[in-house]
Regions:
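Long, contiguous binding/interaction regions
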Residues: 1-81
Length: 81
């Protein structure tokens, strides 16, 4: 199993701003998000974070986010450790 780190920008629509999506990533996908920057307001929000974990789990977490109407933009390369 290979561990990876991806840097992403997550953009939340108004309907998803109040959800604890990073907590869900930890519990459901066994990945570790590390918030680098964020701007969350009542009607919109974004988070730049690194997500560490096993490659298949990180990809599953990103797909889940996309399915929840959260825009996922990859920032830079995927780093393997």
């Amino acid at each position: 199993m290979s561990e990876v780190r991806v840097k992403v920008k997550l953009t939340f629509p108004e309907s998803e701003v109040r959800r604890a999506v990073l907590a869900t990533l930890v519990r459901q996908f066994d990945v570790e998000p590390n918030i680098r920057r964020a701007d969350v307001e009542e009607h919109r929000g974004w988070i730049v974070c690194e997500i560490d974990g096993e490659a298949t789990q990180v990809e599953a977490a990103l797909e889940w986010l996309r399915g929840e109407r959260i825009t996922v933009d990859l920032l830079g390369d995927v780093l393997e450790s």
